[in-house]
Each structure stands twice: as structure tokens, then as C-alpha cells.
Design a protein with these regions (language model features):
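NAD(P)+-binding Rossmann beta1-loop-alpha1 motif at the extreme N-terminus of oxidoreductases
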Residues: 1-63, 83, 87-88, 93-94
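Rossmann-fold NAD(P) dinucleotide-binding segment
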Residues: 51-63, 67-114
Length: 115
């Protein structure tokens, strides 16, 4: 089974990650405010201390972030990009402008990452 990484466990991300865990998947989570991710341990989640740690251990990375700035900060960071596995998949479910999604998609595809 592929490891799933989930970044952003706020109002929408928490229940989404919880449902993935309840479906039996192995999920590693990261949130800037660690206290928002901690309760997911009760459902079997592993808490990552950094984005780099999370993506290094994940085949699929799901992001549920607040806005364009947050997505740009994560998906554009060296920590994120340099630790992704080749041929892994990034699913951004954040509320962002189409241009933001397209730009990150092009960047990730150029690195052999599915988006």
C-alpha cells in the first residue's frame, strides 16, 4: 500500500485526513500548528515534524491549504521539491486561483511528479 502524506489539517483537511485513515490507508500528516494535527494520532496517523520528512516518506501527497500564498510557500519550497519521490503524485485540494494550480502543475510535471 502506498504511503499518503497530508499537508494542512485545518477545518477541511482534518476530516479529509481522518476519512482516509478510517479507510485503512497509512497516512503521515503535517500542519504548521502541530496541535491541529495531533488528534489524528488517535486514528493512526503519523505526525511529521517537517514538510521534507513528510514528502520523503510519501508516494502520494495531498495538500489542503488556506490560500495561494500558503500553497506557493509549500509547493514552491526547496524542502518540498527536493524531497519528493520521482513519479510520486501531488494532489492540491486547496482553494487557489487557476493560474496558481497551472504553474505548480507545470513545475511538478517538469520534475517527473504527477499533479
Amino acid at each position: 500500500m502506498q504511503n499518503i502524506g497530508f499537508i494542512g489539517t485545518g477545518l477541511m483537511g482534518f476530516p479529509m485526513a481522518k476519512n482516509i485513515l478510517k479507510a485503512g490507508y497509512k497516512v503521515r500528516v503535517f500542519n504548521r500548528s502541530k496541535n491541529k494535527a495531533e488528534p489524528l494520532k488517535d486514528f493512526g496517523a503519523e505526525i511529521s515534524n517537517s514538510i521534507g520528512e513528510l514528502v520523503k516518506e510519501s508516494h502520494i501527497v495531498i495538500t489542503m491549504l488556506t490560500n495561494d500564498d500558503a500553497v506557493n510557500e509549500v509547493l514552491g519550497s526547496d524542502e518540498f521539491l527536493n524531497n519528493l519521490k520521482h513519479n510520486s503524485t501531488v494532489i492540491d485540494m486547496s482553494s487557489v486561483k487557476q493560474t496558481t494550480a497551472v504553474n505548480h502543475g507545470k513545475n511538478l510535471k517538469s520534475r517527473k511528479i504527477n499533479y
